[in-house]
Amino acid sequence: MAERTFSIIKPDAVERNLSGAILKMIQDSGLKVVAMKMIHLTRSQAEGFYAVHRERPFFDSLVTYMCSGPVVCSVLEGDNAIQRYRDLMGATNPANAAEGTIRKTYAVSIEANSVHGSDAPETAAYEIAYFFNALEMVG
């Protein structure tokens, strides 16, 4: 059954002109891009998006990093899209990521790990709605 998930290509990857290469990996995996936009998050937008981490010690540095440059947000669709994209991203810490994953290939650190992806259907729905309305999605 087709499912949707949310993806962010983070500032470190956008700055290094890796958006196209990462999108190619996503599409080559069989996932379909049904919505996409490039934005520069404000501090308020980043704080809202990562509100679930507000009490974590890394919250401030995460928000600062996510506001440091443009990001590419997209909605991906396909069978079992959430798990498939998480597998393609690789472990949060690129040192632990499997060969051939986005993070093993492109990430520079645990924070500047190039991509974000939803971890469950509930978070995918929240994250998609945070950045996109229904009119911005195709397919």
Swiss-Prot record:
Major role in the synthesis of nucleoside triphosphates other than ATP. The ATP gamma phosphate is transferred to the NDP beta phosphate via a ping-pong mechanism, using a phosphorylated active-site intermediate. The keyword Cytoplasm applies. Transmembrane segments: none annotated. ATP binds at K10, F58, R86, T92, R103, N113. It is found in: Cytoplasm. It catalyses: a 2'-deoxyribonucleoside 5'-diphosphate + ATP = a 2'-deoxyribonucleoside 5'-triphosphate + ADP; a ribonucleoside 5'-diphosphate + ATP = a ribonucleoside 5'-triphosphate + ADP. The active site is at H116 (pros-phosphohistidine intermediate). Keywords: ATP-binding, Cytoplasm, Kinase, Magnesium, Metal-binding, Nucleotide metabolism, Nucleotide-binding, Phosphoprotein, Transferase. Its cofactor is Mg(2+). This is Nucleoside diphosphate kinase. Belongs to the NDK family. The keyword Cytoplasm applies. The lineage of its organism: Bacteria, Pseudomonadati, Thermodesulfobacteriota, Desulfovibrionia, Desulfovibrionales. The gene is ndk. GO terms for cellular component: cytoplasm. InterPro entries: NDK-like_dom (IPR034907), NDK-like_dom_sf (IPR036850), Nucleoside_diP_kinase (IPR001564), Nucleoside_diP_kinase_AS (IPR023005). CDD domains: NDPk_I. One of its GO terms (molecular function) is ATP binding. One of its GO terms (biological process) is GTP biosynthetic process. It comes from Nitratidesulfovibrio vulgaris (strain DSM 19637 / Miyazaki F). Its EC number is 2.7.4.6. Homotetramer.
